[in-house]
């Protein structure tokens, strides 16, 4: 009798565990169903709004478009951590805008061809998905091409694993195309005004164009989308045109020389912290160009 009771007790325990296992599986299935359902709903909702939201870039000045493209990308990917890099050549890319310290973790300049797993996908014009959660890479990335030349790299962090899907990758691709359209329009506009924007025979931006550019950077800095610094030059012994020729060779492609309404020449240092700007100022001075940081950057 005791043996029968013991056997029945074991059977009850076994069946109880089976019920618990089934409950766990059902719970997981419900969770998966919720994730997939939310993903579908969110994707449909986002696709319906994609054009409307990316079209908001058209309201900005051409020099502002890439800054706010980062905000648009963050909103549509539902992430607080996105970055946009501009490709400087066939090896390096420069950070243009980022929405958080996390999105700046790779630094102001990346040797993207050495980021092998990421570069392999981008070179194939595919979205990179960081399936191994390798901390050296963003969670997702896509490249924007123009005439088979890589122009921009979009990077996204801060998304949960359940959204690192092919559907989300397709969405990032569409967002990239729409951002590209806005950027191409802005660049065409700026190219059309090229001769009007620079002081004749120099690479010095005239006052209105330079003021617009500085304001774009200041507004983006206020929203923590970028860092920047403004350096003002004192009149030296050589002409401004000669000085601009030498200084341009000491500056990055992403930096600008220009005049403001006070008639002085300035350098706008993009994505540059105050500490780094201090080193640039010392380099300019050592080359014979007296200058200083403009502490109050309001125009």
Specify the residue positions occupied by each region the protein language model found:
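Signal-transducing coiled-coil linker helices
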Residues: 45, 55-69, 202-210
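Structured interaction and signal-relay segments at domain junctions
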Residues: 53-59, 68-124
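A short beta-strand signature within small-molecule sensing/ligand-binding domains used
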Residues: 134-143
């Amino acid at each position: 009798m005791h043996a029968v009771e013991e056997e029945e007790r074991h059977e009850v325990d076994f069946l109880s565990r089976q019920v618990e296992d089934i409950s766990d599986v059902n719970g997981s299935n419900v969770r998966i169903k919720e994730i997939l359902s939310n993903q579908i709903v969110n994707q449909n909702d986002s696709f319906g709004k994609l054009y409307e939201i990316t079209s908001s870039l058209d309201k900005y000045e051409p020099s502002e478009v890439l800054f706010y493209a980062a905000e648009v990308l963050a909103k549509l990917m539902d992430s607080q951590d996105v970055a946009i890099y501009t490709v400087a050549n066939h090896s390096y890319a420069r950070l243009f805008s980022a929405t958080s310290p996390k999105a700046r973790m790779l630094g102001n300049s990346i040797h993207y061809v050495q980021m092998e797993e990421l570069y392999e996908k981008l070179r194939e014009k595919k979205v990179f998905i960081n399936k191994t959660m390798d901390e050296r890479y963003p969670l997702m990335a896509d490249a924007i091409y123009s005439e088979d030349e890589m122009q921009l790299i979009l990077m996204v962090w801060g998304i949960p694993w359940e959204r690192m899907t092919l559907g989300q990758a397709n969405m990032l691709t569409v967002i990239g195309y729409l951002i590209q359209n806005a950027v191409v329009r802005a660049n065409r506009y700026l190219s059309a005004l090229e001769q009007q924007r620079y002081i004749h025979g120099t690479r010095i931006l005239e006052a209105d164009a330079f003021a617009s550019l500085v304001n774009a950077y200041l507004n983006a800095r206020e929203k923590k989308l970028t860092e920047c610094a403004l350096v003002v030059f004192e009149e030296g012994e050589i002409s401004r045109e000669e000085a601009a020729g030498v200084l341009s060779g000491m500056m990055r492609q992403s930096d600008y020389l220009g005049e403001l309404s006070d008639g002085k020449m300035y350098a706008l240092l993009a994505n540059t912290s105050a500490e780094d700007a201090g080193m640039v100022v010392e380099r300019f001075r050592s080359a014979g160009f007296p200058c200083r940081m403009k502490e109050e950057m309001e125009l």
